[in-house]
Amino acid sequence: MRDTAFRSIKAKAQAKRRSLWIAAGAVPTAIALTMSLAPMASAQSSNLSSDAVVGSIAQGVTDGLTDYLKPRVEELPAGEVTYPEIAGLPDGVRVISAEWATSKHVILTIQSAAMPERPIKVQLLLPRDWYSSPNREFPEIWALDGLRAIEEQSGWTIETNIEQYYADKNAIVVLPIGGESSFYSDWEEPNNGKNYQWETFLTQELAPILDKGFRSNTDRAITGISMGGTAAVNIATHHPDMFKFVGSFSGYLDTTSAGMPIAISAALADAGGYDANAMWGPVGSERWQENDPKSNVDKLKGKTIYVSSGNGADDFGKEDSVAIGPANATGVGLEVISRMTSQTFVDRANQAGVEVVASFRPSGVHSWEYWQFEMTQAFPHIANALGMSTEDRGVECAPVGAIADAVADGAMGTCLTNEYDVTGGKAQDFANGRAYWSANTGAFGLVGRINARYSELGGPDSWLGYPTSSELKTPDGRGRFVTFEHGSIYWTATTGPWEIPGDMLAAWGTQDYEKGSLGYPTGAAVEYNGGLRQQFEGGYVFRTSNNQSYWVRGEISKKYADDGIFAQLGFPTGNEKLINGGAFQEFEKGNIYWSVSTGAHVILHGDIFDAWGAKGWEQGEYGFPTSDQTAITAGGQTIDFQNGTIRQVNGRIEESR
């Protein structure tokens, strides 16, 4: 595939010749496709017009033939979840959570007022200098999905290298998830279990979230593939003040000419069983005109417009081709429709005096590898429209000094920045993570979820300080960890990454770290009654209010976690102790005793405890407790044991066996 982009306003003289080429080249291609997909159509007419071609192709895609466009179902990697509180959003709109797949890839879950039935997810790829320039704002580049959008993640991150391509660029890449067959439009009525109001969500709800919560400078580009290309142009014409650039990669930029409503209706029926009448009402209605890109092209005057399409010719195996396999027959036909409608749009733009960068290729079909190519070809135009500096469009960089030594094995990937100052040291961003250096610790590179968690906590500015190791494998082989000046972060695929303060790490270490009965941490250390509490798979580690750290495990930890027990017992004053027949643990105001036959029970310091002790504690006459110590209505306390009961009534001890 060669770059054949041209400025349409400078090529009006060629418009007639192009139209003839389309008629002579693209239409026969479509006719050939129609013969294979819809043989009945050719029997009905021996002289097919371009309108008939479109209708015939549409007939051919109503039996699941667009399934090939559906991205592979891939779950996003589980990451640390945060809960941003963003002020000033429209009523009924909030960010429920932000999940950090990596330190530069965040998945927002949003409560929408326009589509309140279920949360909406949006992926953000953060700018190169997001961390090194924490007070800076950045432009947005929106990339809309196609007809077969799935709910797990954007097709862009599954099928293209968009994440890697933009890693060294200073823009926020915005990737809505879902929207199958929606055209990212506000639908007239609910259909097929969905109440699509995508345009309102994107322009009135998502945009303020990015502005107020993710450091947007409100300069925006909107792009899309196939259905998303149509949507990108429509949204830009409806909201011209929001976007400086609009790009369509194989979009359908004429929705109302004869044959196109049939094609769109067929596509929606094929991709999920949707009714096009529920989207824009009856064919020919005002809503169809409002969502016809060619009819509204004049509203884009003064913006940078990029339109691209192949011509349906399969170029797999040819020199300079980006194709990764032979063309799908349906993909040939869909690209022909895209080419014809995009040409109509460009011709209408020429008539209106609206300049378009038209990239009509001499080959190419309706497939993701071509759209990845167009993404890279469109970027210089996007960057110009958004006023991005040369430095913000990519970087020339190299690691030096200690950081260069730390990343010499290549695991960190290519650099995205040069070394920059952070509190007390240096940092440098790489494709796969970030390297840190301080005079006290030396240089270490961090990757993956541990690096993302460290970044979320504040990196070197956090209480952890600088890393003192690279990522290491845990002895049990199940997880990974990194040591820091004041603690560690441990990760497994099931628990995620969690930081452990140094003193609590030492207490955990007395149980042989992750190999012991406590297992891995399952959450962060949180404030708890003047101290800290951190949950593990098999119990807890506590930092008491006087800065002592102890662990509580197993059935004793479950009892201690019951409502109201902390108020009775206070913090632990030591770790669990094994005794004949069971175990016990001492707390500020009492103990918890456990045995296999009795379970775990609470006894408080005081007269009952002393009376039981006088009879030999759990090894004596009464044995282990079989109930918690509780208050009695007569005024006093009572507790049952294996061999009796001890009560305190009005200050007097009563024993019964």
Swiss-Prot record:
Quote the Gene3D superfamilies the UniProt record gives: alpha/beta hydrolase
State where it is primarily located: secreted
Q: Which residues form the signal peptide?
A: 1-43
Organism's domain of life? Bacteria
MF (Gene Ontology): acyltransferase activity, transferring groups other than amino-acyl groups
What does the UniProt entry say about where the protein is found? Secreted
Q: Cellular component per GO?
A: extracellular region
Keyword NADP included in the entry's annotation? no
Q: Which UniProt keywords are listed?
A: Secreted, Signal
Physiological role: One of the two major secreted proteins.
Q: Which PANTHER family match?
A: DIACYLGLYCEROL ACYLTRANSFERASE_MYCOLYLTRANSFERASE AG85A, ENTEROCHELIN ESTERASE-RELATED
- What is the name of the protein in this document? Protein PS1
